[in-house]
Amino acid sequence: MEYASWHWIFLINIPVGIIGAIATLMLMPNYTMQTRRFDLSGFLLLAVGMAVLTLALDGSKGTGLSPLAIAGLVAVGVVALVLYLLHARNNNRALFSLKLFRTRTFSLGLAGGFAGRIGSGMLPFMTPVFLQIGLGFSPFHAGLMMIPMVLGSMGMKRIVVQVVNHFGYRRVLVATTLGLSLVTLLFMTTALLGWYYVLPFVLFLQGMVNSTRFSSMNTLTLKDLPDNLASSGNSLLSMIMQLSMSIGVTIAGLLLGLFGSQHVSVDSGTTKPSLCTPGLAWRLSSPFRRSSLPECQTIRIKTWLFRVEKGARNEVLAARYYRQTVSGDFRHLHCLADQYALGGAYQF
């Protein structure tokens, strides 16, 4: 975003995908199975059901749809999924056979993975947003901060089998689920304390824990499936993974829109819309800081107006960041303010 347009966020996937396809052709063995007729009817029912339900989740915040239209989308999605269940019942050529759910570990693993990935799917989206808006990182540096998370995730792939064989699925899943919560809280704490040099190590640890959790969950989900259902079960698992992560990003966007529209008070006595969540979090974290701001201290935000790039749908006025020095430590207070609240003094 600093050096090119936003389109390159997606275009960069093209060469990566080509390299991945070539590597697959060169390295992966070509296993063959008996082919069967493609279940076009089941595919269309599933595609329609998941697409309209995901669109309905975005709601009026992202799409501008009326409540009646959203209710209609939900109804269409539910009907499409129910029709697929009726279609797949006693149908040996169904896209995803209902016989898959007779395997208890598959059903439990699929449900647990779906719920778990809704939360974990928010992390790759919310972490850069927090680094940029909450801590004032540039888009480039926020992107660099994600590299330790990827390295931690990739590094655990080599040893996760040994970890699961030694401790067992139950202990690994319980420990990694609790560990992911603790690491996420550790990330917030270190960020609010201003220990930015610790953040790469915390993100590396987060990648390790997350990778161990879902690698063990995926193998538990598929390990008891019979050979004739293994391919279908793996495809259904991949579909549920993508759907749950999409839902996670959608929910994260809804939460950002909800809390971003909250109001804060300025010294004029009026209430103006603004996004000042980091300031609130800073106040709430005062018992854990080595030094804190004086009670009820007023910090006057210095603003620097700028307009977004030409061609944007709406011109947006915003405030850049002001660095306040307290007891020799640099404390960041970040507010994304609109034209109504600029120049105000925020109390917290």
Swiss-Prot record:
Q: Where in the cell is it found?
A: Cell inner membrane
Q: Does the keyword GTP-binding apply?
A: no
Give the Pfam families listed for this entry: MFS_1 (PF07690)
The residues that cross the membrane are 8-28, 40-60, 68-88, 106-126, 129-149, 185-205, 239-259
Membrane-topology descriptor: Multi-pass membrane protein
Does the UniProt entry include the keyword Cell division?
no
> What are the alphabetically sorted keywords of the record?
Cell inner membrane, Cell membrane, Membrane, Transmembrane, Transmembrane helix, Transport
- Per its UniProt record, what InterPro entries does this chain match? MFS, MFS_trans_sf
Q: Which gene encodes it?
A: mdtD
Any one of the GO CC terms: plasma membrane
Query: Mind listing the GO molecular function terms for this protein?
Result: transmembrane transporter activity
Instruction: Please name the SUPFAM superfamilies in this protein's record.
Output: MFS general substrate transporter
| Protein name (Swiss-Prot/TrEMBL) | Putative multidrug resistance protein MdtD
Family (UniProt): Belongs to the major facilitator superfamily. TCR/Tet family.
